[in-house]
Design a protein with these regions (language model features):
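Alpha-amylase-like alpha-glycosidases and glucanotransferases acting on alpha-linked glucans and related
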Residues: 1-37, 48
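Carbohydrate-interacting/catalytic domains
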Residues: 26-27, 37-42, 46-161
Length: 161
């Protein structure tokens, strides 16, 4: 539904990073959030992978001194990439998607997003503990742990088809 309000953490839950303690898994979850239907919502601190257990620990103060010292620049840049991808690629906001099951590995999640003009993107998440040889090609829009052919363990690939 296009009016869903999607979030992965909030003032009522443990923070996303607390569930994984792994940036690659963290960004896999955010890639899903920014490519599925609905409105993605980011809780303050998620852009820097802030940790925090259940309430009240999830309501820690924003670490402004760390941000001002540019300690989190790479994380902020990754979040900006995902936000800009969602903003600039209409297909990311489309309601239409399917799971082609094109990979034998059960821990490889692949879905194809389509829009009304026929544009397509593929979202590929390697949740296994083995590298995956990526099939086909396309313009890479967002990637982590991807070398152009192999999607590494806990890797993420979003590409135009």
């Amino acid at each position: 539904n296009d009016v869903l309000f999607n979030l992965l953490d909030s003032h009522d839950t443990e923070r996303l990073m607390n569930r994984f303690h792994d940036l690659d898994k963290f960004y896999q979850q955010l890639a899903i959030l920014f490519t599925l239907p609905g409105s993605p919502c980011i809780y303050y601190g998620t852009e820097i992978a802030m940790e925090g257990d259940h309430d009240p620990d999830c309501r820690r103060c924003m670490p402004w001194s760390e941000i001002e010292s540019k300690e989190h620049q790479e994380k902020i840049a990754m979040m900006r990439k995902l936000i800009m991808l969602r903003r600039n690629e209409k297909v990311c906001r489309s309601l239409h998607f399917h799971f082609p099951n094109g990979y034998e590995n059960d821990r490889c999640v692949e879905y194809i997003k389509l829009d009304e003009e026929g544009n397509k993107i593929e979202v590929l998440l390697n949740a296994s503990d083995e590298e995956i040889k990526v099939k086909g090609d396309g313009e890479v829009l967002f990637a982590r742990e991807f070398d152009g052919e192999i999607l590494g363990v806990n890797g993420t690939l979003i590409r135009r088809m």
